[in-house]
Amino acid sequence: MDRVVLLLSVLSLGVSSQPITDSQRLFSIAVSRVQHLHLLAQRRFSEFESSLQTEEQRQLNKIFLQDFCNSDYIISPIDKHETQRSSVLKLLSISYRLVESWEFSSRSLSGGSAPRDQISPKLSELKTGILLLIRANQDGAEMFSDSSALQLAPYGNYYQSLGADESLRRTYELLACFKKDMHKVETYLTVAKCRLSPEANCTL
């Protein structure tokens, strides 16, 4: 009976009564999941790039460097120093927004040989895990208090009928932005997890 009560306590994520090891365990799961998504994003982007001609790669990369991802509108640390200074809750909140911004667009991430629906379920699981961590680390603070009304459009006209060149550019943009954002989330969650170990060196 005592073991059942303990298990329910862990699942309820009452941070005030939970030892730090419980949060570390949840962080480890979240970091592992986003690492998998980041690797998947890298692979799909590489597969798409390898299907292009050299000149196409050069032109698309040039355009992408001048363009923005939808998620660039989410306020986040500008460099590694600001990342290290950010609170655990802030890093979790930004990570949550980044993952949430891909819920709709991820349905079109079929740039590789893996099943089309592979990414979306993994994103949903990661989003749920981050939300649990946010609740565990809130300590009474209001979640997303700085920009709770922010809503990002799902890559606008990606689903409209486009010419061949424009469709190619949009696919490149989608895959490149997804890879970029999963790298961000992996970095933020890794730093936040490290913060739970006072003696750890969290230098990026």
From Swiss-Prot:
Domain of life assignment: Eukaryota
InterPro entries in alphabetical order = 4_helix_cytokine-like_core, Somatotropin, Somatotropin/Prolactin, Somatotropin_CS
Q: Where do the annotations place Zn(2+) binding?
A: H36, E186
Source organism (scientific name) = Lates calcarifer (Barramundi)
| Annotated compartments | Secreted
Cellular component GO terms, alphabetically?
Answer: extracellular space
GO BP, sorted A to Z? animal organ development; growth hormone receptor signaling pathway; positive regulation of growth; positive regulation of receptor signaling pathway via JAK-STAT; response to nutrient levels
User: Which PANTHER family does this entry report, sorted A to Z?
Assistant: SOMATOTROPIN, SOMATOTROPIN,PROLACTIN
Residues the record lists as Pyrrolidone carboxylic acid modifications = Q18
Descriptive protein name: Somatotropin
Q: What are the annotated disulfide bridges?
A: C69-C177, C194-C202
Q: Which GO terms describe its molecular function?
A: growth hormone activity; growth hormone receptor binding; metal ion binding
Q: What is the lineage of its organism?
A: Eukaryota, Metazoa, Chordata, Craniata, Vertebrata
Q: Quick check: keyword Thylakoid in the entry? A: no
Which keywords does UniProt give here?
Disulfide bond, Hormone, Metal-binding, Pyrrolidone carboxylic acid, Secreted, Signal, Zinc
Where is the signal peptide, in residue numbers?
A: 1-17
